[in-house]
Amino acid sequence: KLRSEARSGAQPSHEEWIEDEGCRRTYYAVYIFFGLLTLTFNHTPAISFNEFDSLELPSSESLWNLEASDEESWRESLTASTIITFREAHDTLFQGDSARYSAFATRVMINALFLEVWYHKRSPEALQDVVTEYKLRLALETWEKSLEICEPETVVVQLSAPHKGHPLIFNAMAMYRNTRARLLVDLKTVQEALRYHDSYEVAASMTNARDKVKRSQEMIKVIQECFECIEVAALQGIRWVARTSATNWSIEHPLCGMDLMVILTLWLYRLEHDEEPATEEELAMYNKLRNLFDDDSVDVYGAKLSSIVARLWGSMIDEVVVWG
C-alpha cells in the first residue's frame, strides 16, 4: 500500500506489480484462514475489516501468471483488467449492484460477508436489528449474482472434479451456503458442544436447538442450500467422496457443511415428528432430499430421512482418510 501511494498514481512496472500483488495475495490468504478459524472455533477475527479499505482485491489468475514480453504489452494487459478495491466491492454489494472481480476476490468477499454475519449474530441488538439483517441478505444475494460476471479464467477442470468452474468459486460457494444459513439460524450452542467431543452434551444441545430451526418460507431457502451441499457428495458418490475428498477438496467443504447438515437434520426431524402437517413446499423439498439416496441407505438406517442424513454425513467425516 505504501509503495502504491509513493508512485502517486503512476502505473507500476511488471516487476513492481508482481511484488505488490504477491503481498496482497498473502494478506488476503491469511484473512481467509482467520475466517475459517472463526467459522470453526467462534474466535473473534484477528484481522479487522477496516484494515483492507482501499487495498485492491486480488487480480485474475490469468494476469497473475502472465509472462509479458515487454513493459508496453504488460501495461495494456493491466489496463484491460478490472481490479477494484475491497471497499468498492463491499459498498457495491451492499447497494445491491453486481460487482466484477476475480475468482480469488470472490472468495475474499464471501469471507468478509461471513464475518459480518458472525459479528451481527454476536451483537446484543441482533434480534431487533432487522435493517442490518436485510442489508446482509441483499449483499449475499448480490454476491451470488456477481458470479455471472466474474473475471473469466482459463482453467482445466478434470472430469472427475465435483465442480465445472474455477475451484476457488467452488470453495466460495461452500462458504456462501454456510453464511446464508447462519444469517437465519444461530447454532452457537451446538457449535460449542461439538468442540469438546462430549456426545451427551452434543445430543442435549441439538435437542434444545430444534426450536431454532423454524418451519417457515425463509427456512425453505436455507434447506435448499443444505440440499445443494449434500447433493454435491451424493451425485459424486457418498463413499467415493468420503474416501477421496480429504486429499483433493478444500477444508471449507466439511467445515461449512457441518452446520448445514445439523440444520438439515433438525429440520427433517421436525417435519417427521411435529403434529403440524407439512406444507406442499416442505413435502416437495423432503421428497427431493429423499430421492438423493438409494434404497440401500434407507434399508440400513431405517425410514427416517433425518437419521439417514445424520448417519451418512457422520460416516463421511469418519472415513479411512479423515479430515485433519
Show where each model-derived region lies:
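Acidic, Ser/Thr-rich, low-complexity intrinsically disordered regions in fungal proteins
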Residues: 1-92, 148-161, 195-198, 238, ...
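Intrinsically disordered, low-complexity regulatory regions with latent secondary structure
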Residues: 10-13, 78-80, 291-324
